[in-house]
């Protein structure tokens, strides 16, 4: 059963909530059967938007970087989920190498690494941190704002008698491409596989897989799949600086706006449809633009064109996703908020609200100035099937967990289809086997 998260929020009645609660036994059995056919990624986070009339994922991250924003109350469940994930991949695992992002000066991100390391250690693993950062030439202690510290070590293909990791866990999304040290490897499990990195992965492929999952799930609970699935399309060969692909992009935006407007009329929704144009690869809230009218794309200023042309690690944008905008009508202390749900293996382990005091309900909240409000578990709570719809927080967050798991299942399908090692028998999906003992350069 998905854990239930505490929140002081209340919202409009969702028909979806009622139908999901009524179908809870069927839904849980459906997920159980799906996980017999598909293997979930080792971990994942999903950004959700709740407009009151629609609840949908807008981003799925296969290298989640906010474990430090989760409530400490979720740690026991996270540890259990990590144990289950590791047991499936490498039951005899003793050592694990964790590879974070290059940026060693972002202490907020490093607090995420500290929390993730703690979870893995409590799951029974000896964890060491290896980095690609050129700044780290030798084992280096990094002090964190909360008083903890991390030992970061340079990576090298060097066998150590006291550290032979069974698995290597990436918390680096490979936006800059595959480092040479990770190429042509065998024998150890690399989680997730290299094909999960942004040098290969595309959001449009994920949402195509999600559309399949949403349609299948909608039949199970008898709902319109649009209630949980944002319309989308994609454009290739776009160059914002040179204004290449501009007409095709405008046409795509217009198509999504028209489809969304038709649904709004069908359900009597008075809000104005909008779309979000975002880089088809990349993360960190970069390369994102809200569009209410296709004509806006003709009048982009230099600042907007620069913003849309390059994302993390200087990755140039040529492919874009055009996604139906989903309003968020949730608030924390009167500030606009959106839930982010975290999972390890197939289990929801917690979540938090991303909050932005200077943004509106139709804007991207993953931007400078955001802050996070952890969601804690409500003790001894299960969905209250007799409660008035929309009135019980456990019911609302059970629903969030269901939709997040649909996105997780979509990620499974997405990675299966892009896995270059799919034909290799005996290899757990989404794990790449690597050779040579791959560990940090110097023993601790």
Kindly give the residue locations of the regions a language model identified:
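Short, flexible loop/turn elements at secondary-structure junctions
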Residues: 47-52, 62-64, 102, 154-156, ...
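Conserved hydrophobic helix-helix packing surfaces used for dimerization/oligomerization
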Residues: 95-98, 168, 275
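Short Pro/Gly-enriched beta-strand edge/turn motifs at strand-loop
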Residues: 26-36, 318-326
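Low-complexity, highly charged intrinsically disordered N-terminal segments
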Residues: 1-28, 38, 44-45, 51, ...
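Phosphate-binding site of ATP-dependent enzymes
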Residues: 54, 252-262, 267-274, 281-288, ...
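Conserved metal-phosphate-binding beta-hairpin within the catalytic cores
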Residues: 38-64, 278, 325, 337-346, ...
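Conserved catalytic alpha/beta cores of large enzymes that bind or transform nucleotide phosphates
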Residues: 86-103, 368-427
